[in-house]
A protein has these predicted regions:
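Beta-sheet entry/capping signal
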Residues: 16-19, 66-67, 123-124, 152, ...
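Metallo-beta-lactamase
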Residues: 1-109, 111-117, 152-194
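Catalytic metal-binding/acid-base residues of hydrolase active sites
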Residues: 74, 131, 159
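Residues that flank catalytic or metal-binding motifs in active/ligand-binding sites
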Residues: 49-52, 149, 183
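Short, solvent-exposed loop/turn and secondary-structure capping segments
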Residues: 79-82, 137-139, 165-167
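Active-site metal-binding motif and surrounding structural segment of the metallo-beta-lactamase
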Residues: 88-152
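Active-site neighborhood of phospho(di)ester-bond hydrolases with catalytic His/Asp-centered motifs
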Residues: 68-71, 123-129, 154-156, 190
């Protein structure tokens, strides 16, 4: 498949990359009107986005570093106002409906274990954006240690700054307090692509 060829290209062409794997986490519902805008004729109000964890191990000065890209804590992410409304609107039937709307394939913890990686061996986590993300489980906060005790968050400075001062229309898509209490030394702010 194309994915297998891409994986092999990463491993063959770049001697720094020593391991790469993607693992399905959860199929999350997303409004079709936002996902496809006007490019659809489907009457379905939702489309599914497959959240995957990408595990990359690479060498830096002959040391292997581990990066987890998109480690979604979907148990905490349901506090995002949009998803909170969606997951509670069916009352007593909500658990059944939620298992249909957002089927879970793996947790991040299961995915990392499948790769044979210990939590303390994770050096970095990162996301394409922080909306809908609660990263406290992974990095810890003032009250609770993180699941990945040595990991640092790689994030664009502009994204981090935006998350700390959301506009009213953005709040529906950001997890309340998703970055609250994270120690500054656990965050690496990036000014540009690396």
């Amino acid at each position: 498949s194309a994915a297998q060829k891409f994986r092999q290209t990463l491993l063959d062409d770049d001697e720094k990359v020593v391991f790469y794997r993607s693992i399905n986490l959860i199929r999350a519902p997303y409004p079709t009107k936002y996902g496809l805008l006007n490019a659809h004729k489907v009457k379905s109000p939702f489309m599914h986005i497959l959240n995957r964890l990408f595990v990359v191990q690479f060498k830096v000065n002959s040391q292997v570093k581990t990066l987890l890209f998109s480690p979604s804590d979907f148990e905490a992410n349901v506090e995002t106002p949009f998803f909170k409304r969606l997951t509670t609107k069916y009352g007593a039937l909500s658990p059944l409906v939620n298992s249909f709307l957002a089927p879970v394939e793996n947790t991040v913890e299961q995915a990392v274990a499948k790769c044979g990686i210990a939590p303390e061996d994770v050096d970095y986590i990162s996301y394409d954006h922080l909306h809908t993300q609660d990263v406290r489980k992974w990095l810890g906060d003032a009250k609770t240690p993180g699941y990945f005790p040595n990991a640092k968050l790689l994030v664009m400075k502009q994204e981090w700054d935006s998350t700390t001062s959301l506009l009213p229309q953005q709040r529906d898509w950001y997890c309340p307090d998703g970055i609250k209490g994270i120690a500054e030394d656990r965050v690496i702010l990036l000014e540009h692509s690396v």
